[in-house]
């Protein structure tokens, strides 16, 4: 489906690591290489990549890995969410990562992200406090989404406990897998030879059942004190 959707207008492929399970990135790389003749770069980064960029939505997969490589260093660019409901949280916010691109200065990409997140200012508050460094410029009409010091402190504290949280989630998921083994449901495979999940969500498809039956299951689970949800409604159903 991805290959069929690519046209000369395609500027990026945005896969989603749903529930914490990494996508098949080898397959995506094969597709972008196969379709590279359709891609017309419009800036220096795109020219250096020489293929349609893979920009991964890793909101669910902080701590996951694909063939031994942590998510965040698999796709060309990746974005993570640190929202309050995520495995790894700073209460709000997130981060972006990228793989090194030959011919492109990583520091230049970093500075561009800084401009985008700090409403175009070319110096942050700390830099402006240094002797004689008060002057700054506005390089563009960008966004206000820089992380606060408090959020960063929460994130650093989370780093210390996160390996234990991942191990705990894996233990719970493996217990669920055993419990659901003989039931008529389809499950995501969180842990395989190719990938290790972050265990963000445990998704269950009720095979051959309609929405009415699903809703009854949700109600019964709620009565048992177990919260469940539907992730996610297709856009046309909203």
Predicted regions located by residue number:
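Active-site phosphate-binding strand-loop segment of PLP-dependent enzymes
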Residues: 2-90, 96-102
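PLP-dependent aminotransferase class I/II
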Residues: 12-16, 21-29, 38, 42, ...
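Adenylate-forming
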Residues: 90-93, 153-155
